[in-house]
Amino acid sequence: MLKLGKVETYIHEKLEREKLHFVLLDPDDVSPELAGELASMSEEVGVDAIMVGGSTGAEGEVLDSVVRAIKESSNLPVILFPGSHGGISKYADAIFFMSLLNSRNPFFITGAQALGAFQVKRYGIEPIPMAYLIIEPGETVGWVGDAKPIPRHKPKIAAAYALAGQYLGMRLVYLEAGSGAPQPVPPEMIGLVKRVIDVPLIVGGGIRTEEQARAAVKAGADIIVTGTAIEKAGSVEKAREKLEELNRGVKG
């Protein structure tokens, strides 16, 4: 019988009480030392989990050392957010086992997943099946993943894909505008998607301010992902201020 793993159970239990804030760290952009520092700070501020990964696909020792540093510095769950099948580290707690549903390339829909599946099993990492949708502009991830980004003014297309993902058995839906996107996913799109699906909705990309985080949550997002705004804050003090600001937007 299929039963939910520890991290997925943690997500569902926390969602019964509040909206969640995940911080995404890209091993291409942060050293293990900085990753550890940001993770420990995230935990103090009230962030709920750390995601590790990026579209250009850091792997091997670079990825492992960042995941290890995070595990040593905080008690937050570490969830892999792989750009491809190389983005797997045995030190992580869970992996968003995701399919880029609006890719034009079957490699990003099921190919990379097949190549990584046995490794996930061998390492005993908890897989969390997720439908991943790229919304305009899509940024680097849209280009790398050969996506056909969903137009910002077509929420119904996003909702159709999201519902298809749920019906295919995926237990989370992620709307992604792309790291560093000029604007986040539009609230109208978040709202429509949330109305049609029954699984938790994650929204990320372009969320830089308390107001943007609050607007996404108000529209229906269950989990907000931030990353670039924190990584690019300029100093550790500024990163903490930005984290606190974004967390206020999510938690209210």
Curated annotation (Swiss-Prot):
GO cellular component: cytoplasm
Summary of subunit composition and partner proteins: Homotetramer. Homohexamer.
EC number: 2.5.1.41
Pathway named in the protein's UniProt entry: Membrane lipid metabolism; glycerophospholipid metabolism
Keyword Cytoplasm on entry: yes
Name of this chain's protein: Geranylgeranylglyceryl phosphate synthase
Species for this entry: Thermococcus kodakarensis (strain ATCC BAA-918 / JCM 12380 / KOD1) (Pyrococcus kodakaraensis (strain KOD1))
One MF annotation (Gene Ontology) recorded for this entry: imidazoleglycerol-phosphate synthase activity
Keywords: Cytoplasm, Lipid biosynthesis, Lipid metabolism, Magnesium, Metal-binding, Phospholipid biosynthesis, Phospholipid metabolism, Transferase
Example GO biological process: glycerophospholipid biosynthetic process
